[in-house]
Each structure stands twice: as structure tokens, then as C-alpha cells.
């Protein structure tokens, strides 16, 4: 790349001379090239300045997030709409920076089983919260999101290290896994959950894109996302007849 750098010696005893006219031509040519590039740089700076750092908040709770034992639920993180009120977005794309979540899981024993010695068995199980990036979002033939079993093979795999099935690795990848092993003798128990997921870094930027086919469809729902949707999977595995109810708040930091 630098052929003269590693030579032992390379000297020239006579000073180099350049015609005066050639220097003038080189200087004027350089100035013209610089002036041509300035308008492009100015336009790019103005375009980027219209996008600003924002945060969108979302709570996920209710009957749809109450899991019976050995079941799983799939959902998605809502993105901002094109709107005048904040938080919003001004383009058909946003830069995803960071996702924070915090909440509780309430584990309840549904039917109390009493043993011969009048003791109540423990409620033991594994609760998992998995955040997955969907590179090419689209609804399946059933009209719903991919299920836990379709993505990871089986719910029982939540006891070990989760992995995307080979046939779907080109479309999905796991971004974060939170797992809690729960053992409780009481009828109910509250478990705190919390985590931070970095989506972009100095070396890598994660951009989400939207279809925005018309004015009414410029929403942040899964059906309007065409690049890098964030999916959330909740799973509760237990041999005891029980249920796990979740209340989780998500804060998505983005530039849009």
C-alpha cells in the first residue's frame, strides 16, 4: 500500500521544480472539487437534524399476559407513529438505541394439593422473557406472530439455552434472555424482573423500517413494520398447576 515506506534509503540530490502554471491549475482544480461537494454535505446535515432522540413507553399486562403452567405468549414492542404529538417519528425509519424493561411476575398456585401428611407441595418452575429481533417482519398464514414453539423448537427448551431453530435463523436472532428459577411454598409470590438491551453501538446501528403505504397506516404496529421488529416472548414452565401473571414496562430509546 506504501511502496516507499520500507525502503532503506531513497534520496534525491536535486530539488524538484514544477512549472508555475501547473501549480495554479492544480490549486484551482482542487477548489472546484471542494465547492461541488459542499451542497451535498449541507443537505445531509439538515436532513439528519430533523430526527431527534426520543423515548416511547409501553406497559404489557392484563389477561393476555397471564400464563397457565407450561404455556407461552408472544407479542411485540410498539414503535412510534408519524404524528405531531410526541413521541413520534418523521421518517419511514428510526434508529433503535436501547430497550429497558422493568416489572413483576406474580406466580399463583391454582389448585392447592394437600399430601397425606397435610403438607402443601412447592410451586416450582422456570419463567423466561426473551427479546427477539425480526429482520423481515410479516404475519404468517394463521395471521399471528410466530409462536414460542415455532421459534425455539419447544417450550421445554426454556430450561436450558434457547436457540432459534436452524430454518429461521436468517430471519430471527435472540437479543436478550431473562430467566428466573422460582420455588415457592406460599400460594402466591412476586418476582422482580429488570433488564437493559443495547440495540445499537459504535460499531453497529440497528434501524427499523416501515411500510407507510398511506396516511392512515403510518403506525408503529407490527403489521406496518418491514424491517427489524422487536418481539417479546413470555414462557412459564412448571409441573404444578399454577399461573404466572406479568406486568412489565418497556422504554424504547430511539432516534426518529
Curated annotation (Swiss-Prot):
It holds the Pfam family Gemini_coat. GO terms for molecular function: single-stranded DNA binding; structural molecule activity. The keyword DNA-binding applies. Its main location: host cell. One of its GO terms (biological process) is transport of virus in host, cell to cell. A motif (Nuclear localization signal) lies at residues 81-96. GO terms for cellular component: host cell; host cell cytoplasm; host cell nucleus; host cell plasma membrane; membrane; viral capsid. Belongs to the begomovirus nuclear shuttle protein family. This is Nuclear shuttle protein.
Amino acid at each position: 500500500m506504501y511502496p516507499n515506506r520500507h525502503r532503506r534509503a531513497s534520496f534525491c540530490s536535486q530539488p524538484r521544480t514544477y512549472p508555475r502554471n501547473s501549480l495554479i491549475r492544480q490549486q484551482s482544480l482542487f477548489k472546484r472539487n471542494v465547492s461541488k461537494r459542499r451542497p451535498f454535505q449541507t443537505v445531509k446535515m439538515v436532513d439528519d437534524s430533523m430526527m431527534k432522540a426520543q423515548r416511547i413507553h409501553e406497559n404489557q399486562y392484563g389477561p393476555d399476559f397471564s400464563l397457565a403452567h407450561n404455556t407461552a405468549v408472544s407479542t411485540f414492542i410498539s414503535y412510534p407513529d408519524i404524528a405531531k404529538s410526541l413521541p413520534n417519528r418523521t421518517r419511514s425509519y428510526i434508529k433503535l438505541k436501547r430497550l429497558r424493561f422493568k416489572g413483576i411476575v406474580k406466580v399463583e398456585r391454582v389448585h392447592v394439593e394437600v399430601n397425606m401428611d397435610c403438607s402443601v407441595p412447592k410451586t416450582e418452575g422456570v419463567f423466561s422473557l426473551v427479546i427477539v429481533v425480526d429482520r423481515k417482519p410479516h404475519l404468517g398464514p394463521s395471521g399471528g406472530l410466530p409462536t414460542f414453539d415455532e421459534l425455539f423448537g419447544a417450550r421445554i427448551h426454556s430450561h436450558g439455552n434457547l436457540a432459534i431453530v436452524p430454518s429461521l435463523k436468517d430471519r430471527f436472532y435472540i437479543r436478550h434472555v431473562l430467566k428466573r428459577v422460582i420455588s415457592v411454598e406460599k400460594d402466591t409470590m412476586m418476582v422482580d424482573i429488570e433488564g437493559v438491551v443495547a440495540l445499537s453501538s459504535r460499531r453497529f446501528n440497528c434501524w427499523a423500517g416501515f411500510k407507510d403505504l398511506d396516511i392512515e397506516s403510518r403506525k408503529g404496529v407490527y403489521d406496518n413494520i418491514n424491517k427489524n421488529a422487536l418481539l417479546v416472548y413470555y414462557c412459564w414452565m412448571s409441573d404444578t398447576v399454577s399461573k404466572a401473571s406479568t406486568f412489565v414496562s418497556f422504554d424504547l430509546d430511539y432516534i426518529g
